[in-house]
Design a protein with these regions (language model features):
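Amphipathic alpha-helical dimerization/coiled-coil segments
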Residues: 1-31, 53, 100-133
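Alpha-helical structural elements
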Residues: 4, 70, 91-92
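N-terminal helix-turn-helix DNA-binding core of bacterial DNA-binding proteins
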Residues: 22, 26-69, 94-103
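Residues within the DNA-recognition helix of helix-turn-helix
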Residues: 76
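Beta-hairpin "wing" of winged helix-turn-helix
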Residues: 61, 81-91, 98
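Hydrophobic alpha-helical membrane-insertion segments
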Residues: 49-50, 85, 110
């Protein structure tokens, strides 16, 4: 089969049917892809985990906790806020950030646990087996 051709007759019709029935609808796949893109940035991920632990922090305290500059934290918070994951509470000239709600927090805690497990089991790292050779 050359590039661009379609396969007209399935080799295994039952598995093709299972694959079709088990896939995400296009819009859900698009939304999930966008969310994973938001979560895919290390600083944004660290901001979220810091807010899980501390509940609420200002930009400066987040920058100190993460040991990164305030511009990086501010940008990360803007992206997270745009996607509805964090909210800002104004207190005079200060802004304090927290996760949007308890559902966001509990969903994020569970998602992080699952993602950490996936990363530990499926991504290269210290536990990587030597390549054959």
């Amino acid at each position: 089969m050359t590039e661009g051709e379609t396969h007209e007759h399935p080799v295994d019709p039952e598995r093709v049917a299972a694959a079709r029935s088990g896939q995400l609808p296009g819009e859900q796949a698009r939304q999930l892809g966008m969310l994973l893109g938001v979560l895919g940035d290390p600083i944004r991920m660290r901001i979220l985990t810091a807010l899980v632990a501390a509940e609420e922090l200002c930009v400066g305290d987040l920058a100190l906790a993460l040991e990164v500059n305030q511009d990086a934290v501010s940008y990360g918070l803007r992206v997270l806020r745009r996607h509805g994951l964090v909210q800002r509470r104004a207190a005079g000239r200060m802004g304090f950030y927290r996760l949007t709600n308890r559902q966001t927090r509990s969903g994020l805690v569970e998602a992080l646990r699952q993602l950490q497990e996936l990363a530990r089991n499926h991504l290269p790292g210290d536990h990587q087996e030597p390549e054959p050779g």
